[in-house]
Regions:
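Detector for outer-membrane/organellar transmembrane beta-barrel domains
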Residues: 37, 90-92, 167
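Predominantly the C-terminal beta-signal and adjacent terminal strand-loop region
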Residues: 155-194
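Membrane-spanning beta-strand positions in outer-membrane beta-barrel proteins
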Residues: 30, 66, 112-114, 149, ...
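Gram-negative (and chloroplast) outer-membrane scaffold detector with strong preference
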Residues: 56-132, 141-144, 161, 183-192
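Extracellular loop and loop/strand-boundary signature of outer-membrane beta-barrel proteins
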Residues: 40-43, 78-84, 130-136, 171-177
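C-terminal transmembrane beta-barrel domains of outer membrane proteins
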Residues: 139-141, 153-155
Length: 194
């Protein structure tokens, strides 16, 4: 008889346990629009700043883990003594981890810190890229971007990104090492999509 009572108790409690298993937070989807400034180095060792912007779509799906896709465009009018400019568009995607915390006080704000590693392609144009045959005005190369940032939410659907910093590695042909390491800084607005 005790066995029957035990089975009946398990059957009675089973729906509550199953209901608890089904309740989970829906994925968070963010769209960030940022101004970006990129510090790069030309072949002769001279440095330059490129300015532009980016649009980034990210989703957090499980305990801070998620993914991001970033499309950025930057332009420098003069990267070398000869006056050659550079326009670069990068399209990268990859994993992201986000840690969030609610700040207590008069104004309750949610702060989120994120770190990411994104890979993709960089398209350089309006410049000079050496090649075995002749110089070209554009090139498509591998791009690796890693870094992170801070988001400060003011409401459920709106946040600001006071700082984002990324290291960007590209492999444009330059007649020397064919490797460029740049730092990209950004700040802007984040829209949290329902």
């Amino acid at each position: 008889m005790r066995f029957v009572y035990a089975v009946m108790t398990v059957i009675a409690l089973l729906p509550a346990g199953l209901r608890a298993q089904q309740s989970y937070a829906h994925p968070e989807l963010d769209l960030a629009v940022t101004y970006s400034a990129q510090r790069g180095t030309a072949v002769g060792g001279s440095s330059f700043w490129a300015q532009g912007g980016s649009a980034e779509l990210s989703a957090t799906v499980y305990h801070g883990l998620g993914g991001a896709m970033d499309i950025a465009g930057n332009r420098a009018s003069n990267i070398s003594p000869s006056g050659v400019g550079l326009t670069m568009i990068t399209t990268t995607f990859g994993p992201r981890y986000t840690w969030s915390h609610t700040l207590r006080g008069e104004f309750q704000k949610r702060i989120s810190l994120f770190g990411q590693t994104l890979i993709g392609e960089a398209h350089g144009l309006d410049s000079t890229f050496p090649s075995p045959a002749a110089a070209q005005s554009d090139a498509n190369v591998f791009a690796l971007q890693t870094g992170g940032g801070v988001d400060l939410a003011f409401s459920r659907h709106f946040a600001i990104r006071p700082l984002e910093a990324n290291w960007l590695r590209t492999q444009f042909p330059n007649g020397a090492s064919n490797i460029q390491n740049s730092l990209r800084f950004g700040s802007g607005l984040v829209f949290r999509l329902p």
